[in-house]
Amino acid sequence: NCLNFGNPEKGKVMGQFVETIDGISQACTYLDFPVVSGNVSFYNETQNKAISPTPTIGGVGLIKNLNLMMTKNLKEIGSYIFVVGKTSGHLDQSEFFREVLKIYEGPSPEINLFNEKNNGKAIQKLILSKLVNSVHDISTGGILLTLSEMCIAGKIGAKIKVPQDNVGPHEYLFGEDQSRYLIEVNEKSKDKTCN
């Protein structure tokens, strides 16, 4: 674990550091997630310009039954892939904005600890109930990159149907809303999983 920041003698940088510590503290308390060690690195600057605040936290968990360990690779041709969590299509600060459109502004996606905990518990329940073949968290790159990683790992392709609701196709496929997962479900588990 490491927290990397610029010069703490500058008010903006110290403010970023304080807000980061506060956010980590809130998340660890709410999610009952211990951070057992850490390092802080200050004065990370180039030509008197600070790096972006870069907190890095590694997590370790216990898997009670290795036979239920979940991986991201798609397992079965003809299975269904569902999104768990709300998709609002947040593109600000996304890989799509930065890498494709060269837009480097806007707020980061909102983090809702209640949704994070509840969606995580729902995924855990699906895994323990043996209702899913594979699971992958949706993060950098949104649904499309996450699904690509699952397809490549499983050497299986996928067809995507973008819902016709209030989120456009780019927002749906590349949005980086938090607390979401892609799950692979086979035909016999589909009805139980969706209830």
Language model regions located:
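Internal, well-ordered alpha-helical scaffold/interface segments
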Residues: 121-124, 145
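Mobile "lid/hinge" segments at catalytic clefts and subdomain interfaces of large enzymes
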Residues: 1-7, 13, 17, 25, ...
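Glycine-/charge-enriched secondary-structure boundary and capping motifs
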Residues: 13-27, 31, 36, 40-56, ...
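Hydrophobic side chains in well-ordered alpha-helices
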Residues: 119-122, 192-193
